[in-house]
């Protein structure tokens, strides 16, 4: 399994959580973004910088993705592509996307995007909190534990 990190909007508070997990389990990790994102120093982490442009990082992740790989992303359309390709996706707030729930999240995202574009909603997502980081750490840990059990 490879861990892919969609680095474009990764909260800094998650970097040490990811680094500890990657180092502890020696998980091959690819951070993909249109600029350098420093997660930490580890031989397990590879930084891939893509050119500027819509969906360039997303396209690279999908190109490199194998079934059973895990993608960390806040991008719901990317999560949908990952699930369709047989991968797994977790967002920064600890939501684990699956074939059972991704279409619901995608529909809600599209609805709110339409409402924002019409000017009815002007605020963005709520601020990222320590509670969100804790939920993310728990979801990542649970996923990696299930993976380790399958290896045995």
Swiss-Prot record:
It comes from the Bacteria. InterPro entries: UPF0178. Belongs to the UPF0178 family. This is UPF0178 protein NIS_0137. It comes from Nitratiruptor sp. (strain SB155-2). The lineage of its organism: Bacteria, Pseudomonadati, Campylobacterota, Epsilonproteobacteria, Nautiliales.
């Amino acid at each position: 399994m490879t861990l892919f990190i969609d680095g474009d909007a990764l909260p800094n508070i998650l970097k040490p959580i990811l680094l500890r997990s990657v180092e502890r389990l020696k998980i091959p990790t690819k951070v993909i973004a249109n600029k350098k994102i420093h997660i930490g120093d580890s031989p397990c982490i590879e930084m891939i910088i893509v050119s500027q442009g819509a969906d360039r990082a997303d396209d690279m992740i999908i190109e490199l993705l194998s079934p059973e790989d895990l993608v960390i992303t806040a991008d719901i359309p990317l999560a949908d592509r990952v699930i369709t390709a047989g991968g797994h996706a977790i967002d920064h707030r600890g939501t684990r996307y699956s074939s059972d729930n991704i279409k619901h999240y995608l529909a809600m995202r599209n609805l709110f995007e339409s409402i924002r574009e019409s000017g009815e909603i002007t605020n963005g997502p709520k601020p990222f909190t320590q509670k969100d980081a804790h939920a993310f750490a728990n979801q990542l840990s649970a996923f990696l534990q299930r993976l380790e059990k399958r290896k045995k």
